Amino acid sequence: MAAAMAAAAALATTIEPCAGADTCAALLGYTLYADMKVSEVAALFGADPRALLAANALDFASPGAANRILPAGLPLRVPTRCACSDGVRKSVAVRYSARPADTLSSVADVVFAGLASADQIRTANGLTAEDPDAPLDAGVKLVIPLPCVCFNSTDNNLPAVYLSYVVRVGDTVQSIAASHATTVTDISNVNAMGSPIVAPGDILAIPLSACASIFPNSASDYGLLVANGTYALTAGNCVQCSCGPGDLKLYCTPASLTALCSSMQCPNSNLMLGNVTAQSTSGGCNVSSCSYAGLVNGTIATSLSSGLQPTCPGPHQFPPLTATPIAVNQGSYLAPSPAPGSGEPGGDIPGFPGGSNVSPANGPSGSASRSTSANRPHQIVALILFVALYFQM
């Protein structure tokens, strides 16, 4: 009984050991605690407002997009860089300025929606073991350590970007897998789960199929990854890259969001970035295309490719963009475009012997870290008090 109670009181987070200074593209699953402007959410995580919209396949090109209001309870994917800190993968770039009535518990459980615990924030900032519900000094700057993993940006040897997902009340591994176009088996392997059982507050690493870039190491956007069914902005918002829905090949075009862009014309060609020409012949189809090759020394690099294909390609299909929502659909997160390949979402999981937190063979070398949830019983009270005070300010 004591062991069962201890297990119930612990919250699991998948961690990835690391060494070195390399980073990778990652996503944070964040649920809004109040109605917020796009720019406010972006500022909270130090992200670009348009990049935030692009990562969620929301219209990022419309005028005033950054000032659109997002409804409370809306789940979002926040793009971040996953670094190596203290021997484990985490995002450590976020800084939060405490406001009146903030506590460690309210910052962890409400403002950052459970992505970090009060204990983790306390440790990251060298604070004393004070009451997590004691008010913080207004204006104090806090480092917010946020969970992320890289796992070589692959899943089953295919390009993938990993989403840090906070388990919500009513979630099951099956429902999480189905809403993210992956499988129970895959989630269990990645998170080294002995059995497909989760509790609210657990943080899972969710592999999302993605389109990978092949830019040179000298490119400032080297390693760009775009999750299937979404977009990413790069080169100072001069270039937009998309993934899917027809295939998992990165496709980049001019973004037309700023006039301060270098030339996007392919060398020795009249083609501009994203242009494709096709000419049918008796032997097939001659296809020429101008592709994005990264931002090198502040200049947009392009690459011209030509070749004979069996048939001429049709018009490129882009992932659909949706308008900024005004109400929350309680169904799920953004549904990715269908990805090529086998594997049904929410499939059955083969039994893993034992209950260890060791990754199965051929799986990523992650592990499950459990931290005390002593602060979690205060979450509902903190939410009510914090939101009430928030609207009085």
Q: Can you annotate each of these PLM segments?
A:
Residues 2-23, 388-393:
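N-terminal signal peptide
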Residues 11-24, 48-91, 117-156, 185-223, ...:
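Extracellular LysM carbohydrate-binding repeats and other cell-envelope/extracellular binding modules
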Residues 24-32, 91-94, 246-253, 259-263, ...:
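Extracellular/mature segments of secreted proteins
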Residues 26-30, 35-41, 60-64, 92-97, ...:
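Short, recurring structural edge motifs at helix starts
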Residues 38-53, 104-112, 118-122, 167, ...:
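Short alpha-helical segments in extracytoplasmic peptidoglycan/chitin-binding modules
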Residues 238-240, 258-261, 280, 285-290, ...:
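Long, charge-rich, low-complexity intrinsically disordered regions
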Residues 314-318, 322-379:
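C-terminal GPI-anchoring signal of eukaryotic secretory precursors
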